[in-house]
């Protein structure tokens, strides 16, 4: 999965997919009442990027739905996975459950079209704080109560705070999550970060008894760091330059080992070599 980083304006969806991304990451900011409000990152953000692009969250969802609904004039068949980077740092811990409920209602209405031929992409809810694990239950309970538990088959989870792997496992236990887990590791492209924890996550994924199904590394903008990430065995790389990742994947060392994921590839299944 080549994951386009910080795709917060509707016009950027086509831009990143046309550069080779089959997945995008979108920031979601919340208002004081825990309503998802804008797709907005703000400053500071990655070096070389404009931090200020934004949409109203519901408008972005409608644009995303168009891009991921077969038959729509805006349809992009390659776009199969969306990571919502949930900026819950602005919320009190006791608002996490409420944020999950409201997120579910927004997605149900504006992305899934109330279960009636909505967008088809798989969705990862990425949460920066382990203490905000109740967001997951708020989300899953609400989709079930609204009569659409089947949509949970399209939803996965990530804790993005680079916490110790054991601590992340405990948070999932508390949240009642037993699958559909992506594990992120990374840092802004302005700084360097080694692959120690990535390798630990990959080992957990491949052990057969860990909690992790997929591992992605962010933010990867250079050919050398792309090769390092692929060599470490990641399933996804998040990038500001999808074309760079595409170029590396076409190199002799990688083109027979890796291919771009399609809609037929289940993002919740651990790949067996």
From Swiss-Prot:
An MF annotation (GO) of this entry: phosphoric diester hydrolase activity
Could you list this entry's UniProt keywords, alphabetically sorted. Cytolysis, Dermonecrotic toxin, Disulfide bond, Hemolysis, Lipid degradation, Lipid metabolism, Lyase, Magnesium, Metal-binding, Secreted, Toxin
Q: Among its keywords, does the record have Metal-binding? A: yes
Pfam families from the entry?
GDPD_2
GO biological process, alphabetically ordered: killing of cells of another organism; lipid catabolic process
Know the name of this protein?
Dermonecrotic toxin LspaSicTox-alphaIA2i
The cofactor note from the UniProt entry for this protein is: Binds 1 Mg(2+) ion per subunit.
Q: Which residues bind Mg(2+) per the record?
A: 25, 27, 85
| Family (UniProt) | Belongs to the arthropod phospholipase D family. Class II subfamily.
Function, please? Dermonecrotic toxins cleave the phosphodiester linkage between the phosphate and headgroup of certain phospholipids (sphingolipid and lysolipid substrates), forming an alcohol (often choline) and a cyclic phosphate. This toxin acts on sphingomyelin (SM). It may also act on ceramide phosphoethanolamine (CPE), lysophosphatidylcholine (LPC) and lysophosphatidylethanolamine (LPE), but not on lysophosphatidylserine (LPS), and lysophosphatidylglycerol (LPG). It acts by transphosphatidylation, releasing exclusively cyclic phosphate products as second products.
Q: What tissue specificity does the UniProt entry give?
A: Expressed by the venom gland.
**Active-site residue numbers:** 5, 41
Organism encoding this protein: Loxosceles spadicea
Q: Which GO terms describe its cellular component?
A: extracellular region
